[in-house]
Amino acid sequence: MSAEDQLTDNLATFARFEPLTAAETAAVEQTAAFLHSRIKIGCTGCRYCMPCPMGVDIPDNFSIWNKLGMFGQPEAIKHQWEAHFPDAEKASHCVRCGKCEAACPQHLPIRNALARLQQELDQL
């Protein structure tokens, strides 16, 4: 916002604010639960865990793993994993040093997740 008319427009958005109905709230909660059930790991892609001393691209590994969980499509994921993901950046190069976990603002179990990810994608 850099002008008064923009501020007025933004405030008008909430002039007729109404909270969600019980049915709308239930629908949002149901959708959130469904999405949460498909996500493999709650990585936001902030990249605070980077750089990895071994060259593992942690957020990109988690992104492809989450795509598998969210959309399925194992053949497409396998192709992306094998053809477009540099081997040097794959989870298999993790030596479990823990530097990434110390930096993660989400406090994710990155080392264990990378091992599960590699095992799951190797089985595609």
Locate predicted features.
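Structured C-terminal cap/extension of enzyme domains
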Residues: 1-124
